[in-house]
Amino acid sequence: MRSFLLLLALWAIACAASAQQPLIFAAASLKNALDEVAAMSPAKATISYGASSALAKQIEAGAPAQVFISADLDWMDYLGQRKFLRSGTRKNILANKLVLIAPAGSSVKTEVAPGFPLAALLGNGRLATADPAHVPAGKYTKAALEKLGVWDSVSARLAPAESVRAALALIARGEAPLGTVYSTDAAVEPKVRVVATFPEGLHPAIVYPAALTSSAPESGAAADFLMLLVSAAARNVFQKYGFTPLH
């Protein structure tokens, strides 16, 4: 049944791609900014947002995406090692920051420092974060909390979400007292506030690589879209949403 549903989903995506090229698979945290950038493209792009891990697995399973934009290097490496990327097209386009957030009405205060009382700050609640088993934002969170020496105190008290935007929604709805997301996610959700920013040395650099997939032609709408991502106009949009352009 699962195989049938996956094939059905891939068929639906293929239909969308044939109608509106190119098909872009992009990390969920890019949605607001990338929607605005895509509006600049003369080609009508179909953009599917989700966890980088899930999108990479879909490409591996045959989804006809022509451009992949990941929220970490690992999942781009995963596809590259399996020959699902067009050689020579990969670019590191953006950087981001990891933040600790709370519902907008929360009065919690803390500094992110070794041994900080994260477990106590949660009270009887849980820490909302993207699933650290495979979603980039969750992996960055686990790495940071391990370096701070507090991971063991909260690892059994997570509210693991399928994507960073799903974790953001948990905090916005008040379903968890604290959570971790990217700074750009917090900036577009008025129902949350940033409690603290994690120093970048606590986790691997948060870098967004983009590349053509092996199913994309060397030139055409997909290649043009990839070039648009590093244009001056796109840089201005990404900066407006809090990303750090790397080109």
Kindly give the residue locations of the regions a language model identified.
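Positively charged n-region of N-terminal signal peptides that target proteins for export
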Residues: 1-4
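Cleavable N-terminal signal peptides
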Residues: 6-7, 17
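Exported/periplasmic ABC-transporter solute-binding proteins
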Residues: 20-63, 68-73, 77-247
